[in-house]
């Protein structure tokens, strides 16, 4: 039986909110400590040091961010509950008890009505017995009946409000309950992995925290969680990353709606998502940029172009984004895509022997999210024309000569060829082998127009393995366009996307992980983990698990050879 004690509930909610506020303050301090530890590159060196920093970066930081979101959302639900109480009982010291209303109150009203009806009938019988002697009016109890009916309606309405309030607030807490269970599972997983007589976090491997216990025996390509595995037993970290990605998008949406117009300095360059001020560096060589290659960057509230011509580049603001209408296919998409000027980061690192982020830092800038695609190594081999690299090196050592940089860039390009498949041998033989393997395992052919598209992509684009957070964001984007992409696949291939004819049940948990009538898994031929396009030509239906996880992603797949060298170390 449900009971609403307004005063006690208000006090309980307020006490909980105060505790959450204290936890949030402690959490923020802990986040700063973890951030500091993860950034101790000078103190934590070598493989062991890198493993420790990676462990805290991947295992602790996302959890703390997720916990912070949980606190904010839980507080929001509690405050909504406080506000909703008045719609049920306006008295701050009121009390509603289902047991009393359902039994005592209803029985009392019913008993009063029955007694009144009996007395009315008795009186009317007596008056009718003497109506030949004296004329007396009959007793009318209709008014009392109306009052009792109104009382019964009030009881029913109050109970309905109580049930509705209870149901709505319980439903509102479901998300918080689910997030709490996710955090609990994650803590249990960490305890299993890193609790014992000897904790070996110095041997932690990047991305291993994404693996749930049920997935430990699944052999997957590239050693990462397949973004297409949409099932109930996703790892806790993967579920947290997905929510963090969604939360990041909501922040982007709020940024889009702001009306502040900010002027962007032209004297900046983006390297691996970091902004460096080049105002103190050399002026651009006079170059004709009329036929230059154009890339786009979003910085603060302004979109600007990067012009690349030969060995020179320049930046030019285009428009304030707060002055134009945007949607998920425009500005939001730009903000959510890559944050790295591919090639410049590796070239800088190769030329100087140092991480540009750990070099001399210039004036800090606001948050930057860039959508610059890869820049050919040949076009940035003489980066010192734009930036005096010496000024970004702590010890003042001179950068390698331009010729040395070109050689390094050439070697880098060779590695990129191994990843992207631009070598002739891979394009002509290995891609066909990979395609035939997919066809053989799934029993469905890849049409020529699809294979041609895949060859073109692998020739012209360099695919690199993404970080867990980048992979989660990439997966979230695909979830939004999956049905559209499948429809385009059907239109372009002339085939019908197959569906499961019966439920697929997990052998370990007994849970239904694919329902009858659900579409087959959408396999990214160029892996999602490597930034494979969410396009029809990069999709192929695969049945879980034999055709997909244990098939295309299984041991011996040509994909392992096709993307050989692409993994980050």
From Swiss-Prot:
<keyword id="KW-0964">Secreted</keyword>
<keyword id="KW-0800">Toxin</keyword>
<protein>
    <recommendedName>
        <fullName>Toxin YxiD</fullName>
    </recommendedName>
</protein>
<dbReference type="GO" id="GO:0004518">
    <property type="term" value="F:nuclease activity"/>
</dbReference>
<dbReference type="GO" id="GO:0005576">
    <property type="term" value="C:extracellular region"/>
</dbReference>
<dbReference type="Pfam" id="PF14449">
    <property type="entry name" value="PT-TG"/>
</dbReference>
<comment type="subunit">
    <text>Probably interacts with cognate immunity protein YxxD but not with non-cognate immunity proteins. The interaction inhibits the toxic activity of YxxD.</text>
</comment>
<keyword id="KW-0540">Nuclease</keyword>
<feature type="coiled-coil region">
    <location>
        <begin position="8"/>
        <end position="91"/>
    </location>
</feature>
<feature type="region of interest" description="Disordered">
    <location>
        <begin position="548"/>
        <end position="569"/>
    </location>
</feature>
<dbReference type="InterPro" id="IPR003615">
    <property type="entry name" value="HNH_nuc"/>
</dbReference>
<dbReference type="GO" id="GO:0090729">
    <property type="term" value="F:toxin activity"/>
</dbReference>
<dbReference type="InterPro" id="IPR027797">
    <property type="entry name" value="PT-TG_dom"/>
</dbReference>
<keyword id="KW-0175">Coiled coil</keyword>
<comment type="function">
    <text>Toxic component of one of 6 LXG toxin-immunity modules in this strain. They promote kin selection, mediate competition in biofilms, and drive spatial segregation of different strains, indicating that LXG toxins may help avoid warfare between strains in biofilms. Mediates intercellular competition during biofilm formation; disruption of the operon disadvantages the bacteria, but overexpression of the cognate immunity protein restores growth in competition with wild-type.</text>
</comment>
<keyword id="KW-0378">Hydrolase</keyword>
<comment type="similarity">
    <text>In the N-terminal section; belongs to the LXG family.</text>
</comment>
<feature type="domain" description="LXG">
    <location>
        <begin position="1"/>
        <end position="235"/>
    </location>
</feature>
<dbReference type="InterPro" id="IPR006829">
    <property type="entry name" value="LXG_dom"/>
</dbReference>
<dbReference type="Pfam" id="PF04740">
    <property type="entry name" value="LXG"/>
</dbReference>
């Amino acid at each position: 039986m449900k009971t609403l004690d307004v005063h006690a509930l208000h006090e309980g909610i307020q006490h909980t909110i105060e505790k959450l506020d204290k936890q949030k303050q402690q959490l923020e301090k802990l986040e700063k400590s973890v951030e500091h530890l993860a950034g101790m590159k000078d103190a934590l060196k070598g493989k062991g040091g890198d493993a420790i920093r990676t462990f805290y970066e991947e295992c602790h930081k996302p959890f703390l961010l997720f916990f912070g979101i949980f606190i904010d959302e839980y507080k929001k639900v509690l405050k909504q509950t406080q506000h909703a109480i008045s719609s049920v009982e306006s008295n701050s010291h009121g009390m509603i008890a289902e047991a009393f209303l359902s039994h005592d109150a209803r029985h009392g009203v019913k008993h009063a009505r029955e007694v009144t009806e009996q007395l009315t009938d008795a009186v009317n019988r007596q008056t009718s017995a003497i109506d030949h002697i004296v004329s007396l009016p009959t007793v009318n109890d209709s008014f009392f009946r109306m009052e009792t009916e109104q009382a019964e309606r009030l009881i029913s309405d109050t109970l309905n409000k109580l049930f509705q309030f209870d149901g709505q607030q319980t439903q509102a807490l479901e998300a918080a309950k689910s997030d709490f269970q996710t955090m609990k599972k994650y803590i249990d997983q960490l305890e299993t992995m890193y609790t014992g007589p000897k904790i070996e976090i110095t041997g932690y491997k990047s991305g291993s925290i994404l693996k749930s216990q049920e997935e430990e025996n699944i052999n997957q390509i590239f050693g990462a969680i397949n973004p297409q595995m949409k099932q109930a037993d996703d790892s806790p970290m993967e579920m947290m990353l997905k929510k963090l990605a969604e939360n990041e998008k909501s922040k982007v949406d709020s940024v889009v709606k702001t009306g502040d117009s900010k002027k962007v300095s032209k004297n900046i360059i983006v390297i691996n998502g970091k902004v460096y001020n080049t105002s103190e560096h050399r002026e651009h060589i006079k170059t004709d940029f009329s036929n230059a290659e154009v890339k786009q960057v979003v910085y603060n509230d302004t979109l600007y172009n990067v012009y690349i011509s030969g060995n020179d580049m320049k930046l030019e603001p285009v428009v304030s984004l707060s002055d134009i209408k945007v949607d998920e296919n425009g500005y939001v998409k730009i903000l959510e895509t890559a944050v790295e000027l591919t090639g410049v980061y590796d070239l800088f690192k190769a030329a100087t022997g140092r991480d540009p982020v750990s070099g001399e830092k210039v004036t800090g800038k606001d948050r930057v999210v860039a959508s610059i695609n890869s820049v050919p190594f040949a076009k940035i081999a003489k980066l010192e024309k734009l930036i005096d690299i010496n000024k970004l090196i702590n010890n003042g050592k001179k950068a390698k000569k331009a010729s040395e940089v070109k050689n390094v860039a050439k070697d880098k390009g060779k590695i990129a060829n191994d990843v992207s498949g631009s070598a002739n041998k891979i394009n002509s033989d290995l891609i066909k082998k990979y395609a035939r393997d997919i066809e053989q395992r799934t029993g469905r052919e890849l049409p020529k127009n699809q294979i041609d598209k895949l060859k073109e992509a692998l020739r012209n684009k360099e695919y690199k393995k993404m970080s867990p957070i980048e992979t989660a964001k990439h997966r979230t984007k695909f979830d939004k366009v999956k049905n559209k992409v499948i429809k385009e696949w059907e239109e372009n291939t002339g085939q019908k996307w197959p569906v499961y004819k019966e439920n697929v049940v997990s052998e370990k948990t007994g849970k239904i992980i694919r329902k009858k009538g659900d579409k087959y898994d959408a396999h990214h031929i160029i892996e999602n983990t490597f930034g494979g396009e969410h396009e029809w030509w990069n999709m192929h239906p695969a049945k879980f698990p034999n055709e997909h996880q244990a098939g295309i992603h299984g041991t011996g797949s040509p994909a392992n050879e096709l993307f050989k060298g692409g993994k980050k170390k």
